[in-house]
Regions:
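Gram-negative bacterial Sec-dependent N-terminal signal peptides
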Residues: 1-19
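Extended, charged catalytic domains and RNA/DNA-binding interfaces, predominantly
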Residues: 20-327
Length: 327
């Protein structure tokens, strides 16, 4: 069923012919047109209770299955008790929960031994016994900023949780009507600087479950993420890509002149990035990443939803030199 998926998020706006053409001759689209001619609406970046941040901020109930149902137009009860429903259903959805401690906080709080018996689960229990739940979100932050100082889940736990994620997407995929993509977010945050990528699979659970997600606990270097995506395609014959976002809170690290280890960016690096990151998320609640008034002073729309005070961790203020490496 899943092999009919297309990466419809890459579709572009159709070309339309108007009746009144300059030479008065009839017009029709060539049958061999090699570009997309349909527009699809969806969301490539959405978190559920499986994400540590969403769970900590109040979404303790809504699951990936709920998200897929909501995207298709079904009414849900939100975490605040309100009834919610889209006026128009979406064509596709990527549930892209954070790979770091994926599903962990929810499973921990409902007493799932799959998580409570892990090193991370025991650490979290200690925080609660101390009466300091704030340390729970701090543990999540550490997982995406310091791989040497966190407690990743064992491989078996990661695989079991990931299988549930992938199977849920399959169950809600309806070829020709609604596309449910399997995905996750790789959440690298070096010194408070945002390097996040959403990873999107074209495949179904028969392939996506063969390898667990590559997280910030594995590496904070984007090149290691790209290698992981290459390993996935080589091992499964499937297709996968990444979508970077929010360069505006990366403090110059999203489109750098040097890699995270200080080496100068070269053509090979650029081509590798283009191979695995063919598109970019330009706007979301944490600011717009398409243009900045300093870089485009003559563009009256360049100041749309500008968020440029600091980085995502709020550990350092923005400096002017950073801007050209963020948009």
């Amino acid at each position: 069923m899943m092999n009919v998926r297309n990466l419809i998020l890459l579709s572009c706006v159709s070309s339309y012919a108007f009746a009144a053409v300059a030479d008065g001759k009839p017009y029709s689209v060539p049958v061999d047109a090699d570009y997309p001619k349909s527009v699809y609406w969806g969301d490539t970046h959405l978190h559920t209770r499986n994400s540590a941040d969403a769970y900590s901020l109040g979404n303790m109930n809504l699951s990936p299955a709920d998200a897929f149902r909501f995207a298709q137009g079904q009414e849900l009860i939100a975490h605040n008790g309100m009834r919610v429903q889209l006026r128009r259903p979406l064509d596709f959805l990527v549930v892209s929960d954070h790979a770091e401690y994926l599903g962990g906080y929810y499973r921990f709080n409902v007493g799932d031994s799959l998580v409570t018996e892990t090193s991370a689960g025991k650490q979290w229990q200690g925080y609660l016994e101390e009466g300091d739940p704030v340390k729970l979100i701090a543990a999540f932050t550490a997982s995406m900023s310091d791989p040497e100082n966190n407690y990743p889940f064992p491989e078996k736990v990661r695989r079991l949780i990931w299988e549930d994620v992938a199977i849920t997407a399959d169950e809600h995929n309806k070829p020709g009507r609604f596309t449910a993509f399997t995905g996750y977010e790789w959440t690298s945050m070096i010194e408070g600087n945002n390097l996040h990528r959403v990873v999107v699979y074209k495949d179904g659970a028969d392939k996506t479950t063969q390898l667990p997600p590559f997280s910030g606990q594995d590496s904070l270097d984007p090149r290691e993420l790209w290698k992981a995506l290459a390993r996935y395609e080589e091992a499964t014959g499937g297709e996968v890509m990444a979508i970077a976002h929010n360069g505006n809170i990366s403090n110059g690290m999203m489109f750098p002149s040097v890699s995270v280890d200080g080496k100068k960016i070269n053509r090979a690096y650029a081509e590798l990035r283009a191979r695995w990151e063919p598109i970019y998320e330009v706007s979301q609640v944490k600011g717009d990443g398409e243009a900045h008034p300093t870089l485009s002073p003559d563009d009256e729309f360049a100041d749309f939803e500008t968020w440029d005070a600091d980085n995502i961790g709020r550990t350092a203020v923005k400096e002017d030199w950073m801007l050209k490496h963020e948009y």
